[in-house]
Amino acid sequence: MRIGFHTDAFNSAYFSFEKCLQWAQRNGVRYIECGLIDGVSWAHGLGYYPHVALFEDPVLLRRKMENYGVCFSQVDAAYPLSGKDGPIRGVPYVIRAIQWSALVGCPRVDTTDGLHAPAGLSDQQALDLMKYSYEQILEVAEAHKITVNIEPHGYFTTKPDYMARMLDFSQSPYLRMNMDTGNTYIAGQDPVAFLKRFVGRTSHVHVKDVSESLAAATRGQQTGIAVSHCALGEGVNAENIKACLRG
């Protein structure tokens, strides 16, 4: 097991990505995950956003990260692929993320669906659309030997039967799952049972606890947690996390 962190943890602290690298070096954390920006953002440009833009040269960034003793475990390219704009916005974004990842030395790219059922599409239509999208994505992923993970975070992916269908879009070894203990819990699922069903397809895990107040207010009504403000072990999901880690 290798422990890292997602730079989302520093969204509210307004860290830059380099400040996250400094934190990782100081605390002896070698692995890091961040989001990818496909374009420019004032917050990122001013150093108030702890993620990376695709215009940043991946080889130069890899060298900078090596100087800090840090490398990527995964990058987050989770534009929802379940809506009508999934093929036209999400697919090109994920493909660029894969190509960039190959140069920066990152082995995995995270993807997901939307939080809600997509407007104007039946569930079957949305699944068909996502299958077509993932087929295009995986062609590029296989060429670059980059794993594409599907994260439980939305309407489809937090339902185990739909996740199973999505993981069966392809038999490629480069299509896997990114487990998330917080998202599955807040969606009303049992994280332990969820992971047990897909443990053979899991290549990366987001470990998130859930506060008692958030669980009481929204469990079974949301499909994901944007940022967890509950430290591990301090919430109602702690025992589930322990069980997941024990396997």
Label each region the model flagged.
Residues R2-F5, F17, I32, Q125, ...:
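Acidic/histidine-rich catalytic cores of soluble enzymes
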Residues I3, W23-V29:
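A short, Lys/Arg-enriched amphipathic alpha-helix followed by its capping loop at the start of a domain
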Residues A9, G47-V52, A78-I88, C230-G235:
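The substrate-binding groove and active-site-proximal loops of carbohydrate-active enzymes
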Residues A9-N11, L36-D38, A78-L81, D113-A117, ...:
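Active-site-proximal loop/turn and secondary-structure-junction residues that shape catalytic pockets
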Residues K19-Q25, P58-Q74, P80-M177, R197:
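Active-site acidic/histidine proton-transfer and metal-coordination neighborhood
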Residues E33-R62, D113-L121:
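Glycine-rich, proline-tolerant flexible connector loops at the mouths of alpha/beta enzymes
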